[in-house]
């Protein structure tokens, strides 16, 4: 069954919250998060990883069914086994696409290094066990989308919590291209469908500065014009 108890958290009176700007600490966490692909060899304490996962559990979810499932991988043996299986699949697919063999070899090696070089992996899975079911394919497809959106929001919570804890992370979409292979390789519980994977650890570098489209390029105000031009995040 899904969780029915309440996670303890401080309550803020809306009347005492500054409407102009978010809390400075939260803003710093959001703006300083980067997708980091190189980590120090030191393994984060398992207690810290568990706190990140607790933050994931606070994410909103469709119907509050909490369809997320997480697999924590910390041993090199398991990481290498997964990286090898996924790399072999990548090589077969790229070869079938008639891509350059040298490019394929380099991409496979890069993928193996990223997966095995991360101290901790968190595989994000979705389960439909407690989601609604429908007779028609259209609504069933939409219901699956609701579940995957829920998992993605939980994953974002993990990445922000990692940043706030002095860790870095990177979202890898590769498991989406071979979910059955990942299920088999890791012997996952039945119905756990891989959706993505987070690498987590202490950063070896600051990551690349992100480039984002300006607000006016991605937002349409239907009711009124914006009050002021937002501050640049660069």
Functional labels for PLM-detected ranges:
Residues 57-64:
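Glycine-rich phosphate/pyrophosphate-binding beta-alpha loops
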Residues 2-3, 66-150:
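Glycine/small-residue-rich phosphate/adenosyl-binding loop
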Residues 91-99, 185-210:
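A glycine-rich helix N-cap at a beta->alpha junction
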Residues 117-120, 167, 190-194:
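Short coil/turn connectors at secondary-structure junctions
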Residues 55-57, 105-110, 182-185, 205:
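Glycine-rich, charged/polar anion/phosphate-binding loops
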Residues 1-22, 194-234:
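C-terminal helix-cap and adjacent tail motif
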Residues 56-57, 122, 128, 139-184:
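Small-aliphatic-rich amphipathic alpha-helix that forms the alpha element of a beta-alpha
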Residues 1-54:
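Short acidic N-proximal helix/loop "leader" segments that mark the beginning
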